[in-house]
């Protein structure tokens, strides 16, 4: 069976427990990386100030075949992630649809995968992520790290599959998951 880790960068939001619980719903390993939050119970503590670099800090500790990512104020839909791996066993990256409270589904159906139409709702082969870590965006923006990784995989001709099922919920409302 294919194994998966979920890396959750956190700054200590109250919603962290909900994110961790959603990850434990399917992951073989869950790593919480606290960024500038020494008071937070976490597997790793860093002070990097950039979500992509915080995610990268977990790389040496991931022992699974695939790695997925979840922000500390979001949740994953467990069955969707596991089913996606079963349906696409040869993929290098699997992008799940993200339910965004303002934008609706992301990636938006019929739109190209470009900046603004890709979120962090993907999983990637761990060895490829280690070889192609997140690159920090322009200073003080922290935008585009997720798309930049997807773009590099597209440029490399990697096998990327798209799931139309919602697998990631951005800032869910109470009772939504």
Across the structure, where does each feature detected by a protein language model lie?
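Short, well-formed alpha-helical segments that are part of the catalytic scaffolds
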Residues: 12-25
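Glycine-rich, basic loop-to-helix element that forms the pyrophosphate-binding segment
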Residues: 46-62
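Short aromatic/hydrophobic "clamp" motif used to bind/position activated sugar donors
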Residues: 67
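Acidic donor-binding/catalytic loop of UDP-sugar-dependent glycosyltransferases
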Residues: 74-87
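Short beta-strand-to-loop element that shapes/binds the nucleotide-sugar donor at the catalytic cleft/hinge
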Residues: 94-107
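Catalytic beta-strand/loop signature of glycosyltransferases that borders the donor
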Residues: 97, 160-167
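A recurrent flexible, glycine/aromatic-enriched loop bordering the glycosyltransferase active site
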Residues: 105-124
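Acidic donor-binding loop at a coil-to-helix junction in glycosyltransferase catalytic cores
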Residues: 141-149
